Amino acid sequence: MPTLEMVRFEGSLAANLKNEPADVELYWLGQAGFLVRSPGLSFLIDAYLSDQLAEKYRAGVFSHARLMAPPITVAELPSLDFVFCTHHHGDHLDVPTIRQIAGKFSDTRFIVPAASESEIASAGLRKERIVWAEAEHEIHLSDTLKVTPVKAAHEGFEYDKLGRDRFLGYLFEVEAGLIYHSGDTVRYPGLLERIIQSGPQLALLPVNGRRPELRDKKIPGNFNLEEAVQFCLDGKISALIAHHFGMFAFNTIDPELIDQAAPKMHNQLQLIKSELGIRYSLKCGARGSDFASPKEKQT
């Protein structure tokens, strides 16, 4: 039976990325950000590596100062094939980070919701480097990566003037299986059925929840932990890496809640807390099968 292996490594993330991956590897970068690598393929999802929001909202009600330092700088990143953004919010579409990546890697392409055209414009990317994403329009990026954007509801749907979704998730079809990164979303009518139709083995879901006082300030929320777990159980998803916490003091949860909930799954679901300093390895051949119990190693 295939495994989702968790390896706790010593030293910096940059140092550990010097070795070529043998399987599909995921590294959490904070908030909703992940680096995904496999042999011959490397891409980012929603990487927030700057501190731009602290300055943008310095005079605001809620401080956006980072609670965690970026685990890696753009200068330290290995070569990247693709950068994915799920929506226009600055901790998901981080223009300073995108601009630096584009300057460092001339061949990297950026997959961005078509409805985020105005937000990405300030990054100064050449048009041939951008792939516009729209819900349910499959994107064949390479022989080892096919991506399907899926509608997301960040406490509700939003559309641009052309009717295109402002919020997206992505289904990543890689050699080891199917990974679902939901973007910022809640469960909405039809989402479960859509995900069951594709059958991902691994879900990357936000668990920071939502609160009326934040909604009133135009800060929409997401799944809470219980909802994310139930969604995976209902969708027969084998493993959940819970994320979107620990970045901003006003909009997070206690990560110990994830640790407390994990043993209660009784082998129905691998509930895994996002952590820095961990390599999550998705062993090739996992597609179509349940994962065995997660293993953790020290390196």
Regions found by a protein language model. Name each.
Residues 66, 109-111, 115, 186-276:
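Cap/insert and terminal regions of metallo-dependent hydrolase folds
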Residues 52, 89-93, 117-119, 137-140, ...:
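Active-site environment of divalent metal-dependent phosphoester hydrolases
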Residues 36, 46, 87, 94, ...:
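Divalent metal-coordination and catalytic microenvironments
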Residues 2-21, 112-177, 261-284, 292:
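Metallo-beta-lactamase
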Residues 52-58, 65, 71-139:
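Active-site HxH/HxHxD metal-binding segment of metal-dependent hydrolases
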Residues 22, 29-37, 140-201, 219, ...:
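Catalytic core of the metallo-beta-lactamase
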Residues 11-18, 41-85, 96-100, 157, ...:
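Pre-active-site segment of Zn-dependent metallo-hydrolases
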Residues 41-43, 81-82, 109, 177-179, ...:
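Structural motif
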